[in-house]
Amino acid sequence: MLKKILLTICLSASIIALAQETFTRKDTLFGGLRPERTSFDVMRYDLTVKVLPKEKKMYGLNEITFKVVENTNIIQIDLFENMKIDSIKFKGFKLEYKREFNAVFIDFAETLSMGNTEKIAFYYSGNPIIAKRAPWDGGFVFTKDKNGKDFIGVAVQGTGASLWYPCKDSQTDEPNLGATIKLIIPDGLVGVSNGRFKGSEKLKNGFTRWNWEVKNPINNYDITLYIGDYIHFSDKHGGLDLDYYVLRENEAKARIQFQEVKPMMDCFQAKFGPYPFKEDGYKLVETNYLGMEHQSAVAYGNQYKKGYLGTDLSSTNFGLLFDFIIIHESGHEWFGNSITSKDVADMWIHEGFTCYTEAVYLECKYGATKAKYYINGLAQNIQADKPIIGQYGVANEGSSDMYYKGALMLHTIRNVINNDERWWKMLYDYAQHFKHQIIDTEAVIAFFNQESKLDLTPIFNQYLHYTNLPKLEFKKVQSHLEYRWVTDVDFFDMPIDIMIRGNKIRLCPTKEWQLFEHKINALQEIEVLKQDFFIDIN
């Protein structure tokens, strides 16, 4: 879905420092918007890919249907420069094109008129990049299972879907009418992709075509393939189809481990609304890398263990109460797949909310106390290396702190609001209001401001644009206490709760010193409820 992108200018020192990073023409071509991109809206991808496992090679065709939104004779489609373009056809004729890094500028030699719907056929081939450590670096993973059969996957978030198929590789545009994915692979293997299975057809020369269809809009990086000796089992839950594809050798383990899907769905649908891609169903697919939120075909590689490969990211032991990959990657169906950021600089919209869903699931199943310990335990993973929001227009993500700090920011805002009924309604309404939309940070802040009837903008700005946490300062003046906030943003008045002599009191500090009306004998009498507010104290 093509949306007009809105950029928020922030004159903070940290953003200015970030802007001093060096970006190239290649970065701008990938991350930026220009007339060759904004002049058309992708309506549908019809992708056919033949994979040769032995050669680690593919031959592909993507039929790209698009609507012209501005008169143009040139459009930009993306395909990594190591991949060969065999031809690009329009109405049966070959088109001229120019390549610049991974961008392909296609010249129609005539003006495409605004309002028309057009289609090109993009034929390509080559050996796609092989990932060194998927999913953290993008590419294909060619391995074998225990029985020596090919086991193949691909993950490209951050790197770009154009690593393996031609597309308009920008988060600002998703195919409005979905996609078809046809996988031509050697006989004896199963090909799995997004959406609904539409049947398989045995071809000549030892190959079979596996056909899949997605009805909903879908992120480019969510379109994927899985190839392996899969067995399939299925279930239903509240009218939602649940499908599972796992290696033959792991069926027994999967039938036990995947029982967590139903209580997860109960929790997430209660808190965030109905599963957003019911028409396409929900799938878990075993893969040869840790995991990825591929829409309606979630990649699962957690080795059938609780926690994160058997470890607890929070060091509280509560992270071992659930399968991290099932919960986290499925949470992305609401936050990241249904609600998508326009620019990767705003990826906290995906990762901060989804990291928070882990604590939400714990709270649903095991109670608020365990959830609170878990989310606070995640703070140990924060690096404070750079701001959460990256640089716009150059395919630049911010700090990985978008996960844990982003989740703790939401936890803090929940306690600022101080009304759980209102908080859960806000989260639910947020997921529904922006369902299947592409948004930016400005839209998120505006929504929470409106629904909370509070000005949360300074809080969002401090956590998202700066590495420093809000610092609460105290000083004792004779028998009285004074307190204030120290922050990077100019105006900051976040309320906070303290305990003093067994009583819970809400303070409303600003950046100016304020006098605490109760007498105290020592600063040690004050306990700031840090488990509810992610802050520093001095």
Predicted segments, located by residue:
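Extended, low-hydrophobicity, Ser/Thr/Pro/Gly-biased non-transmembrane segments
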Residues: R25-K26, A121-D229, I526-I535
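Surface-exposed beta-strand/loop patches in extracellular or lumenal glycoproteins
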Residues: L61-N82, P166-Q171, P175-P186, E442, ...
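Juxtacatalytic substrate-recognition/specificity segment
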Residues: I181, T208-N211, D229-E333, N337-D346, ...
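Beta-strand-rich binding/interaction modules
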Residues: K84-F90, V192, L456-T457, L472, ...
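Acidic/His/Gly-enriched intrinsically disordered linker/tail segments
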Residues: K215, M347, E351-M409, V416, ...
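A surface-exposed beta-strand-loop module
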Residues: F80-T143, G206, N211, E517-I520
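Amphipathic alpha-helical substructures
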Residues: P276, S399-V477, L481
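N-terminal, polar/Ser/Thr-rich
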Residues: A19-Y59, D86, T143-K149, T457-P458
